[in-house]
C-alpha cells in the first residue's frame, strides 16, 4: 500500500509552512464519511496507516504522508436508461400524450434518486506525500484529474494551498526524443525497451514500442519523420524503473527487490515501525529520483 506506483508532482508556489501537528487538526474537519442514500460520491481523509493508527498524518524527516478515500456510487448508463424509458412509457400511457423534453429531464433526476440507495459503491484511496524540505507535493495517481481532486480536498481542509504542476525549462518530449535519437541519457539513467512516439501534427500517428531496442534504425525513422517521444521507460541507478511522460507525470514505478527488502530485518508484526522505515526509505529514494530527473531534463522553469 505504501510504495507509490505513480507520481504527479506539484510545486508549492509560495513559501508556506506545513506542519503535521497543525494539519492533523485541519484534516480532522474533513474525515471520510460514507455516502448517504442520496449521495453520488463522498471524499475525505483516512489514516495513512489504516487500522493501525487513528492519526491522519504520518511524518518523518520533514516528509508528511496523508491519505484520501473516495466512495462513488456506480449506476451504469443502461440501468438508468431502462428505468427512465419504463417511467416515460408509463406516464405517456397514463396521460395519453408525449412528454416534453423538460419533463423527461426532470424524470431522469427522479429515476437517479430512486436508484441511488440500491447502487453499489466503488472505493478508492489516494496517497499524498508532502516534501516540506523541497516544497513539493506528490500524489500517487496516474491522472491529473484524480490528483487535482485530492489537492482540492487538501486546499479545502487547509483554507489555501498555492500549488502548480512542476514545470521544466525545456519541453520534456524534446529531451526524451533526443535521448532516444542519440542513445545518450542523463547521468544515472538508462534507456529501457519501451516508448511511445507521436506525430507533432494533431491527426498524426502514434507508435508504441515494447520489448524493443529503442536505439535502432526502425525508431530513428519515426523520429526523422517528425515524431516525438511522449513516454519513455527508464531505469534510475538500477534502483527504480518507471515511465516518464511528456506531461511531467511519472508512471509505473517499480522499486528493485534490494531496495524493497532493505527493511526486512524489522519484525512485520511491528506495523508502525515497518511503515515508518519504508516511508523514510521510499521518500528518500523518490526525492533523489525527482531531483535527478529535473536536472537531467534541463532544470526547473523559473518561477
Swiss-Prot record:
Any single biological process term in GO: DNA recombination
Gene Ontology MF terms: double-stranded DNA binding
UniProt keyword list: Cytoplasm, DNA recombination
Entry annotated with the keyword Cytoplasm: yes
Major subcellular site: cytoplasm
Pfam families, per database record: RdgC
Signal peptide feature range: none
Protein's cellular compartments: Cytoplasm, Nucleoid
A cellular component annotation (GO) from this entry: cytoplasm
Highest taxon, organism lineage: Bacteria
Free-text function comment from the UniProt entry: May be involved in recombination.
Record family assignment: Belongs to the RdgC family.
UniProt cross-references to HAMAP family, sorted A to Z: RdgC
Cited PANTHER family: RECOMBINATION-ASSOCIATED PROTEIN RDGC
NCBIfam families (alphabetical): PRK00321.1-1, PRK00321.1-3, PRK00321.1-5
Protein name per UniProt: Recombination-associated protein RdgC
